[in-house]
Amino acid sequence: MRKLIFSLAAPLLLSAVAVADDAAPPVAPGAIPSGYVWYSGGSVAVGIGYTWGRGTLYNSKDQKQYPFKLSGVSIADVGGAGINAEGEVYNLTSPADLSGNYSAVTAGVTIIEGGSVAYLKNEKGVVIKLHSQTGGLRFNLSANGMHITLK
């Protein structure tokens, strides 16, 4: 866990500055998704947060489903929440490209129920536009790093 936090923290802060400077979504208007994801999990935080979950990638190219797991850290985050999310995946040339480290800057409030949209991008150029529904109590204006691994 400690190794994950340290390995994601430095690039996370640097990417947070880059993402904050580029307010436009990293997907061209009218782009067609190359896949879709669904996942459920949770998040807890007291300054530094931890997120976990399991999900499924639907690859539009081969019309198959691939299970994955995710874990991640956030900075400037407080609270806890259950998360259900779905999203569109862009720039996916093969299912293996989903695996990797993703970064994003997010802001949100969950008081009993909430939701948000975030763009996550990995080192292979894969972008996930994630729509999440949350339940719990959580306040965040945070830099996030997430690691996704195909099972």
PLM-predicted stretches and their roles:
Residues 1-4:
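Positively charged n-region of N-terminal signal peptides that target proteins for export
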Residues 7-15:
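Bacterial N-terminal signal peptides
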Residues 17-19:
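N-terminal Sec signal peptide cleavage junction
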Residues 21-151:
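Small-residue-enriched, tightly packed secondary-structure blocks
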